[in-house]
């Protein structure tokens, strides 16, 4: 029987029970022990010890005193069964229940009390031992499972490369790349299935992994004359679409480029560091080589690397930006100051819904610094667009000229593009990555510092242009035109303001087109150390231009003044008579101004001569600035046609314009913002020199144009002496 069923009993008046529990070896001490039990009963009850103390000293057998064993009153099986049955119903009996139970079982109420206490303690201990045992078994099982999984992880191999895949040995970038690689591999499998189906229908075999470059002719760029009279920096033979053997390579290259762009656009240090003079983030080439061990291949000898990243908020939704990037006419128009020409050669993949998700197309482009002194960069690449999630898009470019024979481009685009994330109120967060290799040694002149530091085509140049152009679009689409009114300004209706903004937009578009799309002879003449590019265009049946031969002359020069200072001076109407030959020394007045950007200097203005002048000419001026470039563009317009357009509801597209103006760049020596360093100016004039559809260019017309541009350059230089630097 367990100990819980044996309750220590003090002297309860039952001398027979006490005598039976005494030691039989001490016959003479029975009476004494019983009396001792009576004397110390209360003490023994508290301690649970029923021994009688030290009354055995006078024993007749002279033996040493012995401690007596504890006395227990063992309950009968019937008593235990009754109490256990009662315990199951009520483990905590009150005093009345204990008295009733004691009377029923012939026990003392105190015995009942202690039995229930012991029973509760016993049950509690048994439950705790059971729970501890279960937890111990579960813990051992989890330890064993954990050890098994650890061993499995350390022994696992990458199915792609066969290398170890221990998570503890991988960087975050590597882990992210492996996840992306698995997803892109699945896409390739799906596309391969589609390609096989097409192959069965057309009879043209498709190889998944061709190992040799196809004998494909080089692309046909169909660009006009390049800068400095050259014909570009590559062969211009005709080509057809990419053949069936090349397309799988191009697709796999585009998928890998997208994977790399996603990492490049999101990972910070140590992959990216502070850029030159605090401009866009610059790429850590050593870290790049560690992170991306494959891709476009090793860097080309003699090529210079330009890599940067910039992030900004843009006033356009992601789908609008994607559409602008995927259509070459919109792309070249949006980035007219950077992209001279663009062409889509072939669309390899297209989204059936028409939203550009998954579109893959082969393109070529000519990138330019607006100057006749800088050679253009030409690139042949594939552009891939993919939606990465809800409100998140990515567009990536990567050169594919190395897949084609007989082509020698000097600009190679590694994975470059942008990550576009939807924000609130129609805005987008754009992270732009620009990563190119270029061989442009010996083509710098005064632009050497700007180009060699990577600022000419840096990511902040692209982002700054995008932000500025989106501001312009928003202002045209808005009905709340922000005009600057004063006492001498004319009053314009909303139609008049809209017409004026459209004319200013045409001036900018035509100015850039005149710098890049002119065809015909290109002549260079040395004028005080500057080269002047003179080109001709013939205008026929263009309602926005006069018919005849139009000459476009351009040159670049340096000024020892910050870009902001030069921009603010040239845009002011009150300063124009100091440098504009067409003003004939007369003061110009601003009679209307409409802002088309956050910066109030981004605006369209209408200028005219003083009230005493008999001139019928007015000037529409477009001024635009961002941290990387500024423009002061203008065109003389007929006063009568402008009055009809602004007040009579005329079509602004029929106002005849020939734009001229200035492109202002930092010289690369100052900090961003245009408040330090010098300025690089490109001045361009467009003039009608011979009217009529059959007119031809004459030598005197060229001489007149050169003299005009030379005089303007000299006047501006005189206004900014060297001591202002």
From Swiss-Prot:
Expressed in siliques. Disruption phenotype: In plants missing HDG3, HDG7, HDG11, PDF2 and ATML1, increased cell division leading to cell overproliferation. Residues 1-74 are annotated as: Disordered. GO terms for cellular component: nucleus. Interacts with AIL7/PLT7, ANT, BBM and AIL1. Probable transcription factor. Seems to promote cell differentiation. This is Homeobox-leucine zipper protein HDG3. The lineage of its organism: Eukaryota, Viridiplantae, Streptophyta, Embryophyta, Tracheophyta.
């Amino acid at each position: 029987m367990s100990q819980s069923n044996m309750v220590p009993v003090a002297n309860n008046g039952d001398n027979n029970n006490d005598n039976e529990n005494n030691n039989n070896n001490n016959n003479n001490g029975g009476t004494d022990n019983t009396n001792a039990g009576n004397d110390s009963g209360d003490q023994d009850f508290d301690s649970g010890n029923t021994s009688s103390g030290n009354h055995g000293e006078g024993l007749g057998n002279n033996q040493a005193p012995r401690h007596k064993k504890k006395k227990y009153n063992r309950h009968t099986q019937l008593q235990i069964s009754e109490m256990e049955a009662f315990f199951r119903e009520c483990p905590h009996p009150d005093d009345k229940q204990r008295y009733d139970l004691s009377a029923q079982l012939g026990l003392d109420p105190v015995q009942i009390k202690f039995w229930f206490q012991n029973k509760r303690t016993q049950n509690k201990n048994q439950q705790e031992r059971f729970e501890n045992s279960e937890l111990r078994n579960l813990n051992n099982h989890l330890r064993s499972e954990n050890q098994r999984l650890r061993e499995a992880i350390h022994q696992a191999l990458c199915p792609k490369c066969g290398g170890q895949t221990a998570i503890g040995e991988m960087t975050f970038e590597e882990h992210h790349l492996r996840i992306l690689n698995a997803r892109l591999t699945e896409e390739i499998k799906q596309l391969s299935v589609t390609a096989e189906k097409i192959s069965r229908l057309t009879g043209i075999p498709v190889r998944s992994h061709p190992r040799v470059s196809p004998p494909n002719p080089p692309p046909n760029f169909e660009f006009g004359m390049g800068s400095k009279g050259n014909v570009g920096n590559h062969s211009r033979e005709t080509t057809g679409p990419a053949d069936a053997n090349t397309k799988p390579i191009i697709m796999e290259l585009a998928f890998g480029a997208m994977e790399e762009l996603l990492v490049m656009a999101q990972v910070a240090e140590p992959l990216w560091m502070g850029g030159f003079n605090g401009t866009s983030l610059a790429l850590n080439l050593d870290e790049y080589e560690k992170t991306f061990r494959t891709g476009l291949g090793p860097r080309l000898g003699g090529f210079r690397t330009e890599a940067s990243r910039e992030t900004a908020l843009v006033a356009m939704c992601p789908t609008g930006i994607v559409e602008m990037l995927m259509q070459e006419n919109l792309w070249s128009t949006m980035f007219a100051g950077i992209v001279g020409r663009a062409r889509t050669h072939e669309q390899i993949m297209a989204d059936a819904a028409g939203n550009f998700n998954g579109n893959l197309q082969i393109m070529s482009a000519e990138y330019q610094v607006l100057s006749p002194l800088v050679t253009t960069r030409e690139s042949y690449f594939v552009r891939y667009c993919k939606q990465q999630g809800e409100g998140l898009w990515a567009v990536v470019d990567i050169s594919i000229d190395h897949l084609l024979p007989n082509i020698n481009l000097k600009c190679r685009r590694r994975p470059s593009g942008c990550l576009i994330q939807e924000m609130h109120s129609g805005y987008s967060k754009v992270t732009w990555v620009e990563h190119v290799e270029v061989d442009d040694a010996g083509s710098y002149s005064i632009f050497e510092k700007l180009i060699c530091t990577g600022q000419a085509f840096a990511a902040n140049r692209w982002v700054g242009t995008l932000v500025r152009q989106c501001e312009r679009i928003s202002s045209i689409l808005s009905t709340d035109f922000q005009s600057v009114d004063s006492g001498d300004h004319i009053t314009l209706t909303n139609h008049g303001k809209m017409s004026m903004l459209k004319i200013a937009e045409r001036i900018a578009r035509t100015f850039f087109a005149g710098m890049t799309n002119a065809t015909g002879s290109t002549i260079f003449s040395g004028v005080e150390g500057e080269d002047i590019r003179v080109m001709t265009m013939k205008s026929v049946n263009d309602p926005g231009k006069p018919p005849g031969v139009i000459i476009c002359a351009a040159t670049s020069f340096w000024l020892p003044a910050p870009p902001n200072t030069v921009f603010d001076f040239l845009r002011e109407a009150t300063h124009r008579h100091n440098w504009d030959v067409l003003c004939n020394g007369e003061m110009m007045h601003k009679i209307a101004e409409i802002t088309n950007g956050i910066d109030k200097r981004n605006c369209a203005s209408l200028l005219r001569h003083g009230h005493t002048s008999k001139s019928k000419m007015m000037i529409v001026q477009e001024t635009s600035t961002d941290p990387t470039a500024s423009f002061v563009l203008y065109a003389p317009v007929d006063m009568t046609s402008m009055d009809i357009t602004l007040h009579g509801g005329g079509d602004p597209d029929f106002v005849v314009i020939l734009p001229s103006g200035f492109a202002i760049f930092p010289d690369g020596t100052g900090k961003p913002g245009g408040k330090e360093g010098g300025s690089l100016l490109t001045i361009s004039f467009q003039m009608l020199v011979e009217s009529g559809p059959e007119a031809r260019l004459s030598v005197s017309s060229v001489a007149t144009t050169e003299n005009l541009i030379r005089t303007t350059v000299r006047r501006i230089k005189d206004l900014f002496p060297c001591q202002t630097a």
